Amino acid sequence: MTEIFSDTSIRQLSQMLLSLIFFHISEYILAITIHGASNVTLSSLLITKHYALAMLLSLLEYLTEIILFPGLKQHWWVSNFGLIMIIVGEIIRKAAIITAGRSFTHLIKINYEEHHGLVTHGVYRLMRHPSYCGFLIWSVGTQVMLCNPVSAVAFAVVVWRFFAQRIPYEEYFLNQFFGVQYLEYAESVASGVPFVN
């Protein structure tokens, strides 16, 4: 039981808590900064029941493994690689949000609005959905940092599947809004999510 209070677990759990706080607060602050406080709700914190359950299950895996297999959590290079993934994912996602500005929203827009524009510069030159790419890297990184093998695989599969379904839906409307301009962009730039065209 003392493994729960070891230096390793304190470091890993502290980094996880700080990563979660930074991610969610920064998403909310960016939404308010870009769209104005009157246009932003608490949903911009991006905390849903399913997300909270996934994080709770990952914590349960962590605690179970640190008690039963404490050596599993001692792989510092794996944990540090996960921390690097978190930082890289954050940078990509935040660069996407800042670059897109008012064209970025947490919800898929199904109606064209005057301020919408097709963003193809900055990080969008490299991929069509950098915010999804960043979140995928970030979410899997949280589990790699905790040395959670089951949750790392589960997060990768679930988040990838979510975006594999979301991207075609979102791109249907982007095609409606921007027509040939979007089709040409989509043909020349990868989605940013592996195996999703």
From Swiss-Prot:
Pfam families: ICMT. GO terms for cellular component: endoplasmic reticulum; endoplasmic reticulum membrane. It is a multi-pass membrane protein. Inhibited by farnesylthioacetic acid (FTAA) and N-acetyl-S-trans, trans-farnesyl-l-cysteine (AFC). Expressed primarily in flowers, stems, leaves and roots. Almost not expressed in siliques. Detected in root tips and vascular tissues of roots, cotyledons, petiols, hypocotyls, filaments, pollen grains and the distal and proximal portions of the gynoecium. The chain crosses the membrane at residues 16-36, 52-72, 81-101, 140-160. InterPro entries: ICMT_MeTrfase (IPR007269), PPMT_MeTrfase (IPR025770). Signal peptide: none annotated. Induction: Not induced by abscisic acid or auxin. It catalyses: [protein]-C-terminal S-[(2E,6E)-farnesyl]-L-cysteine + S-adenosyl-L-methionine = [protein]-C-terminal S-[(2E,6E)-farnesyl]-L-cysteine methyl ester + S-adenosyl-L-homocysteine. S-adenosyl-L-methionine binds at residues 116-119, 124, 129-132, 170. Its EC number is 2.1.1.100. One of its GO terms (molecular function) is protein C-terminal S-isoprenylcysteine carboxyl O-methyltransferase activity. One of its GO terms (biological process) is flower development. Disruption phenotype: No visible phenotype; due to redundancy with ICMTB. Icmta and icmtb double mutants have altered phyllotaxis, fasciated stems and development of axillary flowers. It is found in: Endoplasmic reticulum membrane. It is an enzyme of class 2 (transferase). Its cofactor is Zn(2+). Its main location: endoplasmic reticulum. Catalyzes the post-translational methylation of isoprenylated C-terminal cysteine residues, resulting in the modulation of the function of prenylated proteins. Involved in negative regulation of abscisic acid signaling. Carboxyl methylation is a reversible and potentially regulated step in the post-translational modification of prenylated proteins. ICMTA is less widely expressed and has a lower catalytic activity than ICMTB. Belongs to the class VI-like SAM-binding methyltransferase superfamily. Isoprenylcysteine carboxyl methyltransferase family. This is Protein-S-isoprenylcysteine O-methyltransferase A. The lineage of its organism: Eukaryota, Viridiplantae, Streptophyta, Embryophyta, Tracheophyta.
